[in-house]
Each structure stands twice: as C-alpha cells, then as structure tokens.
C-alpha cells in the first residue's frame, strides 16, 4: 500500500461527509455514474465474487416505478434526487466465478440451493454498496443511503423473474446543505472497539 491520503481527502471521504437529504437541481451524467462503477468494482469481495448489482434510477419513468415502494418519510427526497441507486445482489453470483476467480473451482463452493449462498451474496453486496458511497464521495458526489422502502415491491418492479434481490437505496447528487440536520455524535473508540 502507498502513502496515507492527505487530511483533505480523509475529510471528503469521512470526517466532513454527510448523509444528504436534499440535492441541488444539477444532473449527474451517465459518464460520471460509469466512472463511479469503475471504482466500485475494484473493492474486495470474498472470492472476488462481486455479487452486487446496481440500478441507477435517473428517469421520470424509473422514479415512478420506484415510488410505490418508498416509505412516506423517504419519498419526497428520493423522487427529487438526481439519482437513486438500487443496491442489490445476485443470489446466483457463483455462475460468474469461473471468470472472476479462475485459479480455483470457486463455483463449486456455492453450488446447491440458492438459500445456501444468499448470505454471502448479501454480505459481499453490502460491502460493495459501502464502496459505492465512498467512491461517490471521492468523485465529488454526495450520498444519502437509506433502507426505508419495501424490498418486495422493488424486487417485483425491477428484478421480477431473476435471482437479484434489493438491499438498500442510495440517493446521489450534489448536496444542498440546507437539507442537513445538525451533525450527530459517533461512538468513541473505547465504546465501539477493543484490543485483545
């Protein structure tokens, strides 16, 4: 690994980054979203499985399809956001492992009933969703992740007849500070971690 990032980069990724509730009326281009994925795909996952699947909802039709699944408290901000990413995972991710992990027969590790690999798909897809948030911040975007929606409705609307399941949503764009709440505290090291 190379040198540590400078303080400004760490601030942008972590210390001064906020969960955004409102965004400027500025579109996010498909080129930027493709660049975002090109960063996300390099994040580590078990056996290089990369089970996450992303739907970048940007059109009026896409937002209309998403709207019935949103909780009342998340609907307005999600419909107004330039981009809403459905972070999902493919429970048949193992079918791609001969390509993604060619130096071992990793596909055989996950053969069998889908339920047996769903946990790995969820865990590693969640990792990739976190990478997406950090990659977005690295590209100058703001993010508003949330789980206040009906997964079954999203799955029916966007993934019907597939082994893909939604996990959480992330609104993306250029944040409007007027929509921020005061910064909430975080647990100290001693409250959240220990040495053994």
Curated annotation (Swiss-Prot):
GO molecular function, one term: oxidoreductase activity
Cofactor(s) in the UniProt record: FMN
InterPro entries attached to this UniProt entry: Nitroreductase (IPR029479), Nitroreductase-like (IPR000415), Nitroreductase_HadB/RutE (IPR050461), RutE-like (IPR023936)
Keyword NADP attached: yes
One Pfam family it belongs to: Nitroreductase
Enzyme class at the top of the EC tree: oxidoreductase
Gene3D superfamilies: NADH Oxidase (3.40.109.10)
Superkingdom classification of source: Bacteria
Keywords per UniProt: Flavoprotein, FMN, NAD, NADP, Oxidoreductase
EC number: 1.-.-.-
Keyword Flavoprotein among record annotations: yes
Family recorded in the similarity comment: Belongs to the nitroreductase family. HadB/RutE subfamily.
HAMAP family: Oxidoreductase_RutE_HadB
Name by which UniProt lists this protein: Putative NADH dehydrogenase/NAD(P)H nitroreductase PXO_03909
Native source species: Xanthomonas oryzae pv. oryzae (strain PXO99A)
Taxonomic lineage from the root: Bacteria, Pseudomonadati, Pseudomonadota, Gammaproteobacteria, Lysobacterales
């Amino acid at each position: 690994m190379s040198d540590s990032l400078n303080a400004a980069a760490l601030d942008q990724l972590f210390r001064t980054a906020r969960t955004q509730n409102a965004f400027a009326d500025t579109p996010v281009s498909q080129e930027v979203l493709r660049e975002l994925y090109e960063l996300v795909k390099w994040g580590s996952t078990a056996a290089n499985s990369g089970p996450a699947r992303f739907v970048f909802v940007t059109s009026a039709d896409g937002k209309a399809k998403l709207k019935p699944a949103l909780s009342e408290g998340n609907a307005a901000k999600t419909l107004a956001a330039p981009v809403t990413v459905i972070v999902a995972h493919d429970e048949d991710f193992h079918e791609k492992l001969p390509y993604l992990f060619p130096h071992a027969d990793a596909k055989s590790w996950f053969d069998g009933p889908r339920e047996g690999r769903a946990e790995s798909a969820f865990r590693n897809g969640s990792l990739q969703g976190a990478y997406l948030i950090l990659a977005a911040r690295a590209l100058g975007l703001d993010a508003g992740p949330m789980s206040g929606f009906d997964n079954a409705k999203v799955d029916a609307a966007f993934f019907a007849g597939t082994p893909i399941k939604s996990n959480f949503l992330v609104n993306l764009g250029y944040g409007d500070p007027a929509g921020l709440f005061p910064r909430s505290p975080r647990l100290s090291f001693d409250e959240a971690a220990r040495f053994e």
